[in-house]
């Protein structure tokens, strides 16, 4: 028996994104980002989360969390976050970094209801 599965509409509510920001991310040690703020202005750039010489293993993720919080504070509330879900990485280190950044991003967004 073939039961059709209804497709889910994963787009954010239009009213929510019209008055709030949308953030797009390319996760990695050097994270690419683009932000459409609540007033329609689009800005983009990169942010480096490369650990320093004397940093502990979790400092990269703490800096990423602080960067997200500051971006949210300065740009107005973020209503939606879009990012690519990578299925395969060439190296083990890249996979671990991506997994840590994605876990940090999803927990940060869940805490804020994004």
Stretches found by the model and what they are:
Residues 1-114:
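Phosphate- and other anionic-substrate recognition elements at nucleic-acid/protein interfaces
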């Amino acid at each position: 028996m073939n039961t059709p599965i209804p497709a889910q509409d994963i787009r954010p509510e239009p009213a929510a994104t019209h008055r709030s920001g949308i953030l797009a991310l390319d996760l990695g040690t050097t994270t690419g980002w683009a932000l459409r703020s609540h007033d329609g202005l689009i800005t983009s750039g990169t942010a480096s989360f490369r650990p320093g010489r004397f940093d502990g293993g979790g400092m990269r993720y703490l800096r990423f969390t602080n960067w997200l919080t500051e971006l949210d504070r300065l740009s107005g509330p973020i209503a939606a976050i879009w990012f690519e879900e990578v299925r395969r990485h060439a190296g083990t280190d890249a996979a671990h970094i991506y997994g840590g950044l994605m876990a940090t991003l999803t927990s940060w967004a869940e805490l804020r209801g994004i």
